[in-house]
Amino acid sequence: MGKEKGHINVVVIGHVDSGKSTTTGHLIYKCGGIDKRTIEKFEKEATELGKGSFKYAWVLDKLKAERERGITIDIALWKFETPKYNVTVIDAPGHRDFIKNMITGTSQADCAVLIIGGGTGEFEAGISKDGQTREHALLAYTLGVKQLIVAVNKMDTTGWSQARFEEIVKETSNFIKKVGFNPKTVPFVPVSGFQGDNMIEPTTNMPWYQGWQKETKAGVVKGKTLLEAIDSIEPPARPTDKPLRLPLQDVYKIGGIGTVPVGRVETGVIKPGMIVTFAPAGVTTEVKSVEMHHESLDAGLPGDNVGFNVKNVSVKDIRRGNVCGDSKNDPPMGCASFTAQVIILNHPGQISAGYSPVLDCHTAHIACKFAELIEKIDRRSGKKIEESPKFVKSGDACIAKMVPSKPMCVEAFTDYAPLGRFAVRDMRQTVAVGVIKAVEKVAPGAAKVTKAAVKAGAKK
């Protein structure tokens, strides 16, 4: 076996009718995690139902249906490989909680693939004023997804028209520029997700197509297919050199072992023997051991979902939403308030000071009050439009001071991105998203330091 391939997460965005499922299904089907047996089973069902042309979307529909019935499907089904990477498709959108998932970041996307329907009228619908496409692209950008690929789909329905492709490239370039991307760094690939043109193999139907190119720090990169474009994603910097931040997903009590917090390492490294602090609980203790998939680790790295055993801490002391960090290296703290840039997505009324919805930030789920609307800003440029507005409504962006209703631990987006973005939930939907600019931290009072931590500290 050669060196293991790098791992990247790709989020697929675009209007519901752009052919996202077919395109994603095609890649997963041809390069991916769906085993032959499952495919044969699906093909047989498709034929029996008269869907004999076996659209790739059928694969995705099946997976989605199973997922929505609460059958957890082996997540490998949402994976495919390129020569350089193992790619995970994050929660193919169209899914209710897409926005929430993208923000609370079960996994942060390294790149977004924007699928545009090339058919007449489709493209226009997708990026009209209220288009979903605009919202998703803006979200991706706001939440720190800085790489983008545009696939112009359904080229087969345009008679493989060069003029139509060029028109869409021009319009889409303007559109993504407004969102914040630089079109020169974005590959534009004409494809047919259904027929397979330019997906994995170069097409023969578009002799005019010379290939895509994008500018990178290292120079110009060129290619033909969508698979090559995904393969050319620049590898993400995994933040191992930052101080540890590990938001807890759960805390278990395991007989004979003790208390075992579980969560995903977002930044830094967790190792046995480390003295860690949990915020906002203010508990400090020693890490006895670190495990992943029931195997003990010398170190848990960013992206790893780990369980770790802590000494002399009861399950009552720490909980989901707490953040674990290194007590000697910028330990996490609770916050009294924080300032954030908030984009209102869909709220039926007006939001003014005093509004207290629930915030989902990393694994925390806590009501926070909009204590003060500091200024209304242009959501693209970030420039101030109005000082101390009385209210904001859907489509607006503002800088607001937020006060959590109970202790919580968050960070500025520029310091620790995964702990610096949040979704505002109300009426069972995501009404706004935000990025934290600054945090007013609270030094813990008489915090609990376990005997194990004191002993281990004295040894050092």
Swiss-Prot record:
The modification N,N,N-trimethylglycine is found at residue 2. Residues 91-94 are annotated as: G3. This protein promotes the GTP-dependent binding of aminoacyl-tRNA to the A-site of ribosomes during protein biosynthesis. This is Elongation factor 1-alpha-A. Residues 70-74 are annotated as: G2. The modification N6,N6,N6-trimethyllysine is found at residue 79. Residues 192-194 are annotated as: G5. The lineage of its organism: Eukaryota, Fungi, Dikarya, Ascomycota, Taphrinomycotina. It comes from the Eukaryota. Gene3D superfamilies: P-loop containing nucleotide triphosphate hydrolases, Translation factors. Keywords: Cytoplasm, Elongation factor, GTP-binding, Methylation, Nucleotide-binding, Protein biosynthesis.
